[in-house]
């Protein structure tokens, strides 16, 4: 920000907030809809409740302060819950969207024993993670988990169906998201870690277009620094903008900050549509 014109930044400072705190400060009301996902309106109250439940469930799965949580999800509500839950327990999300071998390498280096992926992960992919890293099990998230199935148009259902292999991951090493949350209810210990805005929160990998793919680490401090400098234009009493996000993967920090957290923090309605094909974006824009 030192390169910005002085008149633009003279009254701008980076808040000393966690991501959870920043979103709460900019929440227009707990009964206001924060996210729309395939026919379901998700209120701010539900977002905060799910962040708490996810944090407890992560503790119940053995994650703690300083741990890395590998997440291979599209931009579904569960990704938001995992990000906020990870911050609460002092852990960081590890996201990579490269080849299977590169993804396994990232998990191996993280030493994580549990990974998160959609339920269209194949049994063969799960076997590869278990064989070549310390992965013991995967928590699977259905694209339909937070959606209203009857409200999903046919072209979106078809696009989702195309992701499923002949043999999706199954058995005792594949744990459903809702069971993951249920098991977390039994965790009796302390959930939240000491507050630290400079602790690693989000780990992403570069594309590798200019050399070997490298991990880049972001904290709440750096993420909010980027978020806050863009958070000028929000809703008004007369008009609340909508923000449609389609196929961009949340394995990039720019997507997480600028495309997910920014609309939420500036009182825009975030519409998550991660399974829309690029050629169907016009259909979705007309729908919303």
Each PLM stretch: what is its role?
Residues 3, 21-43:
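AMP-dependent adenylate-forming
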Residues 31, 158-205, 212, 236-243:
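Conserved pre-ATP/AMP-binding loop-to-beta segment of ANL
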Residues 33-84, 100-104, 218-221:
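Conserved AMP-binding/adenylate-forming core of the ANL superfamily
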Residues 43-45, 192, 201-228:
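Conserved AMP-binding A3 loop
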Residues 48-53, 183-187, 216-237:
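Conserved structural elements of the adenylate-forming
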Residues 73-84, 98-101, 247-265:
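Conserved coil-to-alpha-helix start sites within the AMP-binding
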Residues 88-179:
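Structural core segment of the AMP-binding/adenylate-forming
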Residues 90, 224-243, 250-288:
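Conserved AMP-binding/adenylation subdomain of ANL enzymes
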């Amino acid at each position: 920000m030192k390169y910005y014109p002085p008149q633009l930044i003279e009254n701008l400072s980076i808040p000393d907030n966690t991501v959870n705190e920043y979103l709460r400060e900019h929440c227009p009301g707990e009964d206001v809809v924060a996210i729309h996902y395939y026919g379901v309106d998700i209120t701010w109250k539900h977002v905060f409740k799910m962040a708490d439940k996810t944090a407890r469930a992560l503790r119940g799965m053995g994650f703690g302060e300083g741990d890395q949580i590998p997440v291979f999800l599209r931009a579904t509500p569960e990704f938001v819950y995992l990000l906020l839950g990870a911050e609460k327990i002092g852990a960081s999300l590890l996201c990579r969207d490269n080849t299977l071998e590169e993804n396994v390498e990232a998990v191996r280096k993280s030493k994580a024993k549990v990974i998160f992926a959609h339920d269209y992960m194949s049994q063969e992919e799960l076997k590869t993670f278990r064989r070549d890293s310390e992965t013991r099990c995967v928590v699977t998230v259905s694209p339909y988990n937070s959606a209203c199935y009857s409200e999903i148009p046919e072209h979106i259902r078809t696009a989702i169906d195309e992701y499923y292999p002949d043999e999706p991951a199954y058995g005792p090493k594949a744990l459903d998201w809702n069971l993951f949350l249920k098991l977390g209810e039994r965790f009796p210990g302390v959930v939240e870690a000491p507050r630290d805005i400079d602790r690693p929160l989000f780990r992403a990998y570069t594309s590798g277009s200019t050399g070997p793919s490298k991990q880049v680490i972001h904290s709440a401090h750096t993420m909010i620094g980027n978020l806050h400098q863009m958070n000028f234009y929000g809703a008004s009493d007369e008009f609340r903008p909508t923000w449609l996000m389609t196929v961009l993967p949340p394995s990039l920090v720019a997507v997480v900050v600028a495309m997910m957290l920014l609309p939420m923090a500036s009182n825009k309605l975030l519409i998550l549509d991660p399974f829309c094909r690029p050629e169907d974006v016009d259909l979705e824009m007309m729908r919303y």
